[in-house]
Amino acid sequence: MTVFNPVWRVKIQGVEYTTYTLSNLTITSGRNNIYQQAQAGYCNLELLNLTQAIVNIHINDSVSIELQDSTATYVPIFGGTVVDFGVEIITAGSVGINQVLKITALGALSRLPKALTDGVLSQDFDGDQIYEILQDLLLNNWGEVPAALQWQNYDPSETWANAQNVGLGEIDRPGNYELAQRSSDRTDVYSLVSALATSGLGYIYEDASGLISYADSTHRSIYLATNGYTDVTANHALFNGLKIETRAGDVRNDITLKYNTNSNNEVSAEDIPSIDVYGRLAQVITTTVKHTVDAQDQADFYLTLRATPQANFTSITYQLTNPELDDADRDSLINVFMGLPLRISDLPPNMASGTFLGFVEGWSFKAAYNEIAVTLNLSPISYSLQAMKWEQVPIGESWNTITGALTWETALVVA
């Protein structure tokens, strides 16, 4: 048994708020399901102010929320900017006035729907096209540096490569699918980048510091092959509200996939046995994949994995202050990220046969004084796995782990 008392570090515009007590916190990150791209992370933060001290917080100030793990190391769990700020009196009397500072912050993805681009792109792979769009918005050049900026305000070790990075994280480059060129057509950055990510069978996301990142189609397969599953037990979760759902809405047995420049061409795939059982459940997927063979591969991939329904883990909650939760599991949950492979054991036998294998799609932290819980939603492992290229295979992979009858063309990582 391990006792865990949350220790927080809240920074706003680089200033650590050490004299204020965190009274309430809600953080939501990721996405609700695998069929959509991630939305901006959301943070609702309340700090108790017992001294009526002047608070220097403004709209667009940076926000960083960190939580200590079992090694007393601060782990970032949210990064973003202030969008709403208020001061409210909660009690008043002869002994004084108590206030609460109410702060709402959003992650860097919130900037993309409000930024416009002509979106001119040459034919290139998905990761490179996404980087081309995002770097123009999130990496400043000399002409975009604020005129009043002074060198003395920079860390001497800072390099120009990241000195004016205002939100760009890790981008998987070049990606795995070659996408068609794009001519000038004004649109918002979020719509364009989301479409490019969908075309590459990947997803955009915010990391724990709030930076915008992109994971390509084999990102999860490679991570799983390299690091394996994070194992947790349902015995340490809050059983009330633990939920697995199997939905007809997840079934896709008639796929039309549009591809090429302006999505002018299309391929199709259908699964007759699935149609016989569930009826025809069709979907049109719009991409800018360049090559017909890649478009057909994508259509077949959607069909192979989604022709029959699979259980989704829509909700499981862990109270991180639970003393039965060991340090390793607690630290893994504090470090949760979109795409974390989890193996949840000790479920009731009528729920995923007692063990669920999946990837984290979204999560929320909820905290009060000396309390914190994390709620996860996961997709089935097979919804995400993609065959890797030779050069992507982890160097530690052993030949004896691969069945002799497996062809590389159809190999999926199931470790």
Could you describe each region identified by the protein language model?
Residues 58-62, 186, 337-345:
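Glycine-centered loop/turn motifs
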Residues 69-74, 91-246:
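Charged- and aromatic-enriched interaction segments used to assemble
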Residues 1-18, 122-131, 135, 191-357, ...:
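Acidic, small/polar-enriched beta strand-loop surface segments
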Residues 48-50, 65-69, 85-91, 142-144, ...:
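Short regulatory "switch" loops immediately downstream of catalytic or recognition motifs
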Residues 45, 105, 196, 257, ...:
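Terminal peptide-recognition signature
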Residues 71-81, 348-359:
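Short coil-to-beta-strand transition motifs
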Residues 1-128, 368-373, 381-385:
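Beta-strand-rich assembly/attachment modules of structural machines
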Residues 40-42, 137, 333:
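Conserved long hydrophobic alpha-helices within structured protein cores
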